[in-house]
Amino acid sequence: MKHAYVFPGQGAQAVGMGKDLYDNVPAAKELFEKANEILGFRITDIMFAGTDEELKQTRVTQPAVFLHSVIMAKALGVKPDAAAGHSLGDFSALVVAGALSFEDGLKLVSKRAMAMQAACEAQPGTMAAILGLEDKVVEEICASVDGVVVAANYNCPGQLVISGAVEAVDAACEKAKAAGARRALRLPVGGAFHSPLMEPAKQELEKAIAEAPFQTPVCPVYQNVDAKPYTDPAAIKANLIAQLTAPVRWTYIVRNMLSDGVTEFTELGPGSVLQGLIRKVDPNTVVESKSTL
C-alpha cells in the first residue's frame, strides 16, 4: 500500500488558512514566525486576518499556500511514499520529501512569486478553463488562434486551463464554445501562468534554483512538466525552471501514481481542489483533504 501526499497551488488560498496550526502547535508557530522573518513582512497577518484582495496578490498567495501545506505536513509528521504538487505545489512536495529545506524552499517560492508578478505586470495575460472538450481539441484550437495561447493545466479529463495574451485567450474561448465546450470561462488570475509570457520570470528564477542546495528526496516526486517521478536533484532543478512556461500535467501525474501502485492520496493545505480533480481522474481511488489538524 502506497500513500501519496499532494499539495495545491495558487487559487486554493482562503483568509484564515493555517491559523489553527499557529494557535495550537508551538512548532508550527515557530515556523510561521521564521517565515515572517525570511519574507521581511508578516505574511501571517494577511493569511489569518487579511482581505481576499491582499491574499490574492501573487507575491503573497504563493508563499502563503506553500507555508500552510508544508507546516501542516510537518505538524502531522507525514512520511510519504510519493509526493506531487500542482504548479507552486511542486515546491511544497519537494520540501516535504526532503529535497529542499523549509528555508530554501520558502526563499525560492517567494522569488518565484515576485518574478511571476513582475512578468504579469510587464505582459498582461489571462487564463481560462475549458470544460467538456477532449485535450486534443483544445490544443488544436489554441494552435489555430493568432497570438499567444497554450494549454496550461491538464487538471482532469474534460477540464483543461488555457493561458496567454488576453485577446488570444478570448478568441480560443469563443472557438471552444463553437466546438461544443460545456463552459469556457476566464479565471480570476493575475496573468498568463505556465505560458511563454512567463519567460522573463523563468530567466529570473533560473540562477536562484541553480544555486539552491537540493538533496535526493526520501521518495519520488512526480513533477509537473512531464508527470514522471524524480529523485535526481539536477533533474528536479531543471524541471522546476522549465515548469514556469510549461503546462501542469496533473491528470497524468495522478494516472502515473496510480499505475505505480499508489492506493491512497492525502491533499495537505488550503481547500480541496486536488481531491476533486483526483476523484475525476479515478472515482474509485481513496483520497482525503486536510486543511486543519
Predicted regions and their residues:
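Glycine-rich phosphate/pyrophosphate-binding beta-alpha loops
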Residues: 61-63, 192, 247
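Alpha/beta catalytic cores of group-transfer enzymes, especially the acyltransferase/condensing modules
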Residues: 10-12, 39, 97-245
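A short, well-structured juxtamembrane/interface segment
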Residues: 248-256
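FabD-like malonyl-/acyl-CoA
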Residues: 1-137, 183, 187, 264-293
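Non-catalytic positions within long, well-ordered alpha-helices that form the structural scaffold/packing
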Residues: 177, 258-261
